[in-house]
Amino acid sequence: MTQKHRQPEVNIGLVGHVDHGKTTLVESLSGEWTDQHSEEMKRGISIRLGYADATFRECPELDEPDRYTVEETCPDGSESEHLRTVSFVDAPGHETLMATMLSGAAIMDGAVLVIAANEPVPRAQTEEHLMALDIIGIDNIVIAQNKIDLVDREQALDNYEAIEEFVDGTVAEDAPVVPISAQQDVNMDLLMQTIESEIPTPDRDPDADARLQVARSFDINRPGTTWEDLTGGVLGGSLTQGQLEADDDIEIKPGREIEEGGQSEYQPVETTVRSLQAGGEFVDTVTPGGLLGVGTGLDPSLTKGDALAGQVAGPPGSLPPTRESFTMDVELLDRVVGEDAEEIEPISTGEPLMLTVGTATTVGSVTSARDDECEVQLKRPVCAPDGSKIAINRRVGARWRLIGVGTLR
């Protein structure tokens, strides 16, 4: 008897331009649709990070790539063998939602960059997402050239050459390009084979203190639930180190905002892990990899509507400091990513920046700027260790655009 549900051991981001087929690709591999927010259904684009797990299996008697499958039964009727379960993070491809994409990148071990074969390369968001992977240092990348069913052979080859030219000199320059049709299920076995070889499960230290990067938080109680039947708030995110068990005590930082005498400050929140969910199953222990649901004893009003997204949880006393301001070393890009591609001016004192640190996105005001470093005062504090990478966005026209990367000092 095979174990059908296993905890995912690696997080793979799906990135690329809106409507290039990322969500269809997840559905093809996992049978799940990641757009589970009502607003997303209406607009047809992933707004918050969508998650879905897929179990890769193989039929050992078949040749590559035919041996790779997500089915439990091989063509000859025998049972397929479990390779590993992966968690896909479907990052939004919508321009104004770049911050969500960047917060998702903080929990990705590798990425599949989805590029449509029937559109010019690169589209603005494709370029911006690739830049984000570069900034955060994700270099295990596979490129899926999707929608090949909509073009002829010559168009597909021209598009392939455009992709190769586009990724030249970037973190994805050696990434394999796999032609697929997620809609028609073409070459999905080859894509799985390529993911297996290019995006390995990272080595992790099982003895480190648990650290959960919170990317979502929910109140799962239905309206009208009586207080006796209320379920505590739920955190969704990724364990980046250590392990977490039911009944563990955890601290969440920066925590909740407390207002006193017209001043507000953030205070860490402590609670107990009531339940753990991984790979769609309730489990007693979770290890790094995949996306988890952590049921807590928190008042659900604290967690509803992603109120704790961007926070960090772990054993009390083990977390990095909460920072209301910090100094960072800055490396600016040569130009703003996007259609207008204008040059980037140096950061100046007084300007607002949108900063993504781990899964947290906050706005900071620059209090001091020198050549390659600046100090910022944050609107909402973050919990982050020294050396953290920070994506820096500046207001360009009506949008926040990625302009560089900072390293927390």
From Swiss-Prot:
Residues 146-149 are annotated as: G4. Its EC number is 3.6.5.3. It comes from the Archaea. InterPro entries: eIF2G, eIF2g_C, eIF2g_dom_2, eIF2g_GTP-bd, P-loop_NTPase, Small_GTP-bd, T_Tr_GTP-bd_dom, TIF2_gsu. eIF-2 functions in the early steps of protein synthesis by forming a ternary complex with GTP and initiator tRNA. Residues 7-203 form the tr-type G domain. Belongs to the TRAFAC class translation factor GTPase superfamily. Classic translation factor GTPase family. EIF2G subfamily. This is Translation initiation factor 2 subunit gamma. It comes from Natronomonas pharaonis (strain ATCC 35678 / DSM 2160 / CIP 103997 / JCM 8858 / NBRC 14720 / NCIMB 2260 / Gabara). It holds the Pfam family GTP_EFTU. The gene is eif2g. Heterotrimer composed of an alpha, a beta and a gamma chain. Mg(2+) 2 binds at residues 19, 44. GTP binds at residues 19-24, 146-149, 181-183. Residues 16-23 are annotated as: G1.
